[in-house]
Amino acid sequence: MNLKEFIIPAIDLMEGKAVRLYKGDFNKVKVYSERPWELAKNFSDLGFKRLHVVDLEGAEGGKPKNLEVIRKIRENFEGEVEVGGGIRSYEVAKALFDEGIDFVVIGTLAYKNKEEFLKILENFPNRVILAIDSKQGKVAIGGWKEETAVSPEEFAKEYENYPIWGYLYTVIERDGSLEGVDVEPYKEIKKHVKKPVIASGGVSSLEDIKKLYGIVEGVVVGKAIYEGRITLEDLQNF
């Protein structure tokens, strides 16, 4: 596997712009682009195979707010596109698939309304990624604002035998922080599941990516690319 397949660049959307939050805090926002679809085109031209898109306002408010921009991103990226944030119903998931999105990333709905979540899995098998967002060792939902008593391992195992594609596992305390990756949570969850796991949160350097390589099947990288911590030269020389 080459790094362009392992790394999944992230575009987080707010008010139609590409932004990054610091540790999931909606008050700590940095804008990186007013035209996110141009970022998507750049990532496509560079040969990345998958793009991770998050509708932050959707995650916070419960339904996607940046559909027009997501549509443009889809048009400008040749590989696979996965979208998360505010997918709390079958209708919203279907609307995204109808736009040509390859995978949807869902966490809150899987926790709060299993019946509705299973309806999506039934109609779109192997196209749903279960979002496991971990805060101090417990799953957080609702745009990371609501904490549960469930461990990431318990949440993952609940759906391991259903037709999900795999898992997106985010360590919230590190997300957008450039503090580096803790590989232990990923090693732990891999003991419990066989489906692919994508890591997310805290990647700050090529070293972090090397640490994760061989443990998980992919890694979402956002801020480290936008802040120049990981350069294209790094990727080509890996």
UniProtKB/Swiss-Prot annotation:
Pathway: Amino-acid biosynthesis; L-histidine biosynthesis; L-histidine from 5-phospho-alpha-D-ribose 1-diphosphate: step 4/9. Pfam families: His_biosynth. One of its GO terms (molecular function) is 1-(5-phosphoribosyl)-5-[(5-phosphoribosylamino)methylideneamino]imidazole-4-carboxamide isomerase activity. Disulfide bonds: none annotated. Its main location: cytoplasm. Its EC number is 5.3.1.16. It is found in: Cytoplasm. It is an enzyme of class 5 (isomerase). One of its GO terms (biological process) is L-histidine biosynthetic process. InterPro entries: Aldolase_TIM, His_biosynth, HisA_bact_arch, Isoase_HisA-like, Isoase_HisA-like_bact, RibuloseP-bd_barrel. Belongs to the HisA/HisF family. This is 1-(5-phosphoribosyl)-5-[(5-phosphoribosylamino)methylideneamino] imidazole-4-carboxamide isomerase. It comes from Aquifex aeolicus (strain VF5). The gene is hisA.
